[in-house]
Regions:
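Solvent-exposed interaction surfaces and binding hotspots enriched for charged
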Residues: 2-206
C-alpha cells in the first residue's frame, strides 16, 4: 500500500479520535455565554505543543537543554522541531493552514519564545506558564489511557492528534469572532512555548 494511502488512513483515524477530545474540551470550556474561546485555544494549542515534547521523550529522542540561572531546564532541538514545525503534519502547520500566516511571522514567534523561556513575569498569551504547564500535564495524564493511547498507535501520532484538536478549536474561535491572525498567533505561541517545558521547567513555588 502506498505511503500516501497509509497517511490518509491515519489522518482519518486521528480525526475521528480528535472529535471525541474536541467535544470534551467544548464542555470543559463552556460558559453561560458560550465557549471561552481564548482559554480553550490557549489550552488546546499548548497541549499540542506538550504532545510534541512527550513524543520525543517516548521515542528516546534528543533535546538541546537550556538551564536558567534558577536551575530550571527548557528543551529545544531538531527532534522537537520535527513535530512542532517540520513534518508534513506538524503542529504549527495546522494553525498556519487556517490563517495563512507566513514563515517569517512563525519564525519570529519561535525566536520570541526562545528568548522568553524562564523569564520572570512572562506569560503565555496572558496565562502563567507554570500554572498552564501543571494543568496541561494533569490533563494529559488524565486522558492518556482512555483517549490518547486509544486513538493513537504510536507516539509520533500524538502531535497530529492534538494538532487536529487545536486546529478545530482555532476555527471555532475565529467563527466566534476572534480575529484570524491574532487567534492563530495565540495558538502558535502556546504550542511553541509549552513544547519547551517539562516538570523541571516549573518553579517549585510557581
Amino acid at each position: 500500500m502506498a505511503e500516501q494511502d497509509i497517511n490518509e488512513q491515519v489522518i482519518e483515524r486521528l480525526k475521528e479520535g480528535a472529535g471525541h477530545i474536541i467535544n470534551m474540551f467544548k464542555s470543559v470550556f463552556n460558559t453561560p455565554i458560550g465557549m471561552d474561546g481564548r482559554r480553550a485555544l490557549t489550552f488546546t494549542a499548548a497541549i499540542a505543543g506538550y504532545a510534541c515534547h512527550q513524543a520525543v521523550k517516548a521515542e528516546h529522542g534528543t533535546f538541546a537543554v537550556v538551564t536558567t540561572n534558577d536551575g530550571r531546564n527548557f528543551y529545544f532541538g531538531d527532534d522537537l522541531n520535527k513535530y512542532l514545525l517540520e513534518n508534513n503534519m506538524n503542529v504549527v502547520g495546522f494553525f498556519t493552514a487556517v490563517s495563512g500566516i507566513g514563515h517569517e511571522t512563525v519564525l519570529q514567534i519561535v525566536k520570541d519564545c526562545a528568548l522568553a523561556v524562564g523569564k520572570d513575569q512572562h506569560t503565555v498569551c496572558g496565562f502563567n506558564p507554570n500554572i498552564l504547564y501543571k494543568e496541561i500535564s494533569e490533563c494529559w495524564d488524565g486522558i492518556f489511557e482512555n483517549m490518547t493511547s486509544r486513538f493513537c498507535e504510536k507516539p509520533s501520532e500524538w502531535p497530529v492528534l492534538f494538532g487536529i484538536v487545536a486546529q478545530n478549536i482555532l476555527i471555532m474561535s475565529i467563527d466566534g469572532g476572534a480575529p484570524k491572525d491574532e487567534a492563530s498567533m495565540v495558538a502558535i505561541e502556546s504550542a511553541v512555548y509549552m513544547s519547551k517545558m517539562d516538570c523541571d521547567s516549573v518553579l517549585k513555588n510557581g
